[in-house]
């Protein structure tokens, strides 16, 4: 929780240390290293926790009444890109860089996590394998845009771009499931 909050405050994973985490959590380094073998392992846990929370929110939204398009739009705006969502501060490249520093067991955990997310999503959204791959790429575009810092004058353009991407993704999902 403290690390997640730190990522939010710092607007990304760059530039903070184990000491920053322990200070935010008000624990000693020994306690930190009792729980996590490294900063990267801690960050992995934050991502895993965040994805689980997003998955639960996704299921809740998908169970509600409404069109698939409106539910996808709501999920993307209110959960996937909420103000404190890790997707705003933690890019796919960041996650890949962290995985490179961790033992292979973390890659296996990431694969299981991805499979669980995909299997759950497939119960609500009927897409072919190629369409799922396209959706994942579209979500990567959304995350890429969300994680980038822009000059103050471009913030409005960023917000507009995110909105266009959200509606495009929701349109795509609804259109493909009707085919």
Predicted regions and their residues:
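Solvent-exposed, amphipathic alpha-helical segments
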Residues: 3-11, 53-64, 138-149
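Helix-turn-helix
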Residues: 7-41, 45
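Hydrophobic alpha-helical connector segments
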Residues: 45, 56-85
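Amphipathic alpha-helical packing segments from all-alpha helical-bundle domains
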Residues: 52, 85, 99-129, 133-137, ...
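A short secondary-structure junction motif
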Residues: 53-54, 82-86, 116-120, 142, ...
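Hydrophobic/aromatic-rich alpha-helical bundle segments in the mid-to-C-terminal region
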Residues: 122-168, 176-179
